[in-house]
């Protein structure tokens, strides 16, 4: 008798949403930020940051997983070395939890939680507001490309 009730409660608790793209805007949290544009996104986890090209699509469970380029050596001196990475997470209403996993080392950054319309609160590292203002080449350099060019 209890099993059907539990199954019914579990089904009612499952929150499915219409698949789509993460909303354009500023998503902020403690030591985290996600600046979403129609053509991509810029994310910060602590003193690291990454870029996503294109929209961030999510499924009916709010889950997403997209390719990114991630810089883990941005502070105190940004050397402009980017790693291929995956940014993944889950959207839940106006909040979103995400992390980044570097492809070459497997290092995981996060997870962090951000909220749409909230300003990021960064303690030591400022968030990059304008991608064009960042002092780096427009094409991300991978760690392997930097090593072959003789850059530490």
Placement of each model-derived feature along the sequence:
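N-terminal glycine/threonine-rich, aromatic-flanked beta-hairpin/loop signature
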Residues: 30-72
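C-terminal motif of bacterial Sec signal peptides marking the signal peptidase cleavage site
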Residues: 10-11
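Tryptophan-anchored aromatic micro-motifs
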Residues: 17-33, 66, 98-100, 121-147
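An anionic, turn-rich surface loop/hairpin at beta-sheet edges
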Residues: 66-90
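Surface-exposed, polar helix/loop patches in the mature regions of secreted/periplasmic/lumenal proteins
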Residues: 82-128
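A short, polar/proline- and glycine-enriched secondary-structure boundary/capping micro-motif
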Residues: 52-56, 75-79, 106-114
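Bacterial N-terminal signal peptides that target proteins for export
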Residues: 1-3
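Short, solvent-exposed mixed-charge patches
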Residues: 149-152
